[in-house]
Curated annotation (Swiss-Prot):
It comes from the Eukaryota. Residues 330-379 form the FBD domain. SMART domains: FBD (SM00579). It comes from Arabidopsis thaliana. CDD domains: F-box_AtFBL13-like. Pfam families: F-box, FBD, LRR_At5g56370. This is FBD-associated F-box protein At4g10400. The lineage of its organism: Eukaryota, Viridiplantae, Streptophyta, Embryophyta, Tracheophyta. PANTHER family: F-BOX/RNI SUPERFAMILY PROTEIN-RELATED, FBD DOMAIN-CONTAINING PROTEIN. Residues 1-47 form the F-box domain.
Length: 409
């Protein structure tokens, strides 16, 4: 220890940066040489979801006493994991004020919420010029003041927070001129109503909702879009601008998203879970990779095969909660072999394959008609004897591609 203590402060602080903040703080009891070294750390994380009430009280006393004395001129990252039943909002606001005064770059707060969500964010945070990443999760009330300017903010994550007014989020977004990544996980009582996302600089957008929503999206620079509906609701979409979109993940099993589907036809990669048809007039000319989750119907598979002329890779995932009704319940074979089967499809993978007659018919159809297929991989969790039967059935089927490698696992 004496040999280590003889190292320069910069080296010791660098060593401390590789251990959890709690461990770094504990080194202050080693000697006077170590007493204040942790205060030069630029990345701080305090709290835990597993803390007891007494541990949270000790943490509060520690932060009240020591955080204002922190010596690092810049705090790169400040993370708090709290239980709001043990902290007053004004205490948390004071800690964030200190972090803002040290030109904070990343702020992440998780607050478990047992009662009414609290406003724990100081007004100074909304004008922090150095802030690049802001992540809020749980018991947080977002009360956006009139004065907002976050010129450096590139990543914003809001999970389960409540909004003071319906326009709070939009006011915040309007004042983030370089925002690139946005994650919004809504809740039943978030006070949001219509969700409006108008951000010219945005490149990646992820939305999750447990209830019916109206979405207004204008994101001309968007490259990646994710939408998750946790309760099979209906939604209204007004999408003005997504010309650069390259990948999308859509998990809305029973929602009618015809108003959305026309805005994602430019994607190269698409993962989608849906049981609702989309009608005619949509062509995915750029789509190369498609992942489909289907419980009940093969109609969506047929629809995409017909409307994706340049598809190169197809992945199917069988999903169900009822073991007696596994797999797609119907297979309506296309009357004409889709263009992608004849000219572009090279890779086919089926996850959780169960070998029911309709599943087998789909797999056999693809093997029989995909002329350019290079690999077909069937992954199954069934018993060994059943799996051997599946393998035999598919190996005996005819294949349009003489170079196709058929794999089972």
């Amino acid at each position: 220890m004496d040999r280590i203590s003889g190292l320069p402060d910069e080296v010791l602080v660098k060593i401390l940066s590789f251990v959890p903040t709690k461990v770094a703080v504990s080194t202050s009891i080693l000697s006077k040489r170590w007493e204040f070294l942790w205060m030069w750390l630029t990345k701080l994380k305090f709290g835990s979801k597993r803390y007891s009430e007494s541990e949270f009280k000790r943490l509060q006393c520690f932060l009240d006493r020591n955080l204002p004395l922190h010596r690092a001129p810049v705090i790169e990252s400040f993370r708090l994991v709290l239980s709001d039943s043990h902290f007053k909002p004004e205490d948390i606001r004071m800690w964030v004020v200190v972090a803002v005064s040290r030109y904070i770059r990343e702020l992440k707060i998780y607050s478990s919420h047992y009662g009414e969500k609290q406003n724990i964010l100081p007004s100074s945070l909304y004008t922090c010029k150095s802030l690049v990443i802001l992540k809020l999760d749980g018991g947080v009330l977002l009360d956006v003041p009139r004065m907002v300017c976050l010129p450096s903010l590139k990543t914003l994550e809001l999970k389960g927070v409540r909004y003071f007014k319906q326009g709070s989020l939009q006011r915040l977004l309007c004042n983030c001129p370089v925002l690139e990544d946005l994650v919004v996980n809504l809740s039943h009582h978030d006070n949001m109503g219509k969700l409006t996302v108008i951000v010219p600089s945005l490149q990646r957008l992820s939305l999750s909702t447990p209830s019916s929503r109206e979405f207004v999206i204008d994101t001309p620079s968007l490259l990646s879009f994710q939408l998750v509906d946790r309760n099979d609701n209906s939604h209204t979409f007004l999408i003005e601008n997504m010309p650069k979109l390259r990948e999308a993940y859509i998990n809305v099993p029973f929602a009618d998203i015809k108003s959305l589907i026309g805005s994602i036809t430019s994607v190269k990669r698409l993962a989608i879970s849906s049981e609702v048809g989309y009608g005619e007039g949509f062509i995915f000319n750029h789509l190369e990779e498609l992942t489909l989750w289907n419980k009940y119907s093969s109609n969506l598979l047929v629809w995409f095969l017909k409307n994706s002329p340049n598809l190169r890779e197809l992945m199917l995932v069988s999903e169900t909660d009822d073991h007696e009704n596994l797999g797609m319940l119907s297979w309506n074979q296309p009357s004409i072999v889709p263009e992608c089967m004849l000219s572009s499809l090279q890779k086919f993978t089926w996850f959780k394959y169960l070998g029911r007659p309709q599943d087998r018919d789909i797999a056999v159809y693809i093997l029989k008609n995909a002329c350019r297929l290079r690999t077909a991989t069937i992954k199954s969790d069934t018993r060994l004897f059943t799996k051997l039967e599946m393998i035999t059935e598919l190996r005996l089927s005819s294949q349009a591609s003489s170079t196709c490698e058929l794999n089972f696992s």
